[in-house]
């Protein structure tokens, strides 16, 4: 299976977002998605490693969404090697090809979960936030705690003890202020009150 026959070969790499050109990725990561800034009338990406190939057409707004099953098959083939990414775009009746860029697939695994606080950019809606975990192999996001359960207060600065998911702490402000320590199924609130004032802690470290 091949991509289109190009009428014109371009000199510059495609303008994509996020900029995934020539990066190293971990094995067994969820399919990378990117958008072609100028998709034209049609766009196609050809991913290949050795004899393993997959071809995906972009959506109308230029986004490439790679099927998970085919992606995982290609990724398994490419561990410790490179995936060649070739992007084509059609403008009217003319196919254009961009130079190939690479994704190097590391043989070294990384932790399967990321944890982060999710809040609107610019903090305009700080009263709607939460701390979430994302499984990097399938990109599923699940909440650890959302402030819809705590009167829409501010929560921040979560930290795990030596990357142990069973032991962490985070701070809350406004309603229910304080520092909370989770140890397995146990939750403890630290008493940080000095006199009549609750001292808000920041930037924890184990």
Annotate each PLM feature:
Residues 1-206:
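Sequence signature of WD/YWTD-type beta-propeller architectures
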